[in-house]
């Protein structure tokens, strides 16, 4: 279970590192970054000697299935949020269309109004950068929202493992229920299918609790 959650977090984080490195050397975000990130993360997981072979491959297959299903669902679900449609999606679109924020402060590939430019150029864009690698690969602007589901799924698993470690005598179903309640708070549920990012720090912080246990 832990390797499943670890992979779901590793893939977007590796995508982010590759995207930033590409931008830093003067390249653009392209359709190869996300598949390469998946391959690197899977190879890294395969190299873990602590995991038995059958468990390792079962985990990898499960993660690939989750990636496929969530990408398909996200591509079909339209982001109806205000900020999600506005500067979040605009930032992703600019990155996909060739904007390099490291070497160019102006969003030049496509014309956008001055007020939106202020948000696109100066708002932190970590999640948007990861989403842009997904969108560039999938060719669908809404597909990047799958990232939300990966982080949420991993947080559920990590909370469950945290409870297993700290409260080993607790009923298994009660642990599952608590993990779902903690991971799926109202903000997370409301923003899970949008490009809002208010939930991100909470979800990653919750996942971090298992590492500190």
What are these regions (language model features)?
Residues 1-54:
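Membrane-embedded, hydrophobic transmembrane alpha-helices
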Residues 142-143, 159-186:
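Transmembrane-helix signature of polytopic, membrane-embedded enzymes
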Residues 209-213:
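Conserved small/polar residues in nucleotide/adenosyl-binding loops
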Residues 187-200:
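Short acidic/glycine- and proline-prone juxtamembrane loop motifs at membrane-interface regions
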Residues 36-38, 152-156, 182, 197-208:
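Hydrophobic core segments of transmembrane alpha-helices in multi-pass, intramembrane catalytic enzymes
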Residues 77-91, 97-130:
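Extracytoplasmic catalytic/substrate-binding loops of multi-pass membrane glycan-assembly enzymes
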Residues 121, 125-128, 137-157:
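Loop-to-helix entry region of an early transmembrane alpha helix in multi-pass inner-membrane enzymes
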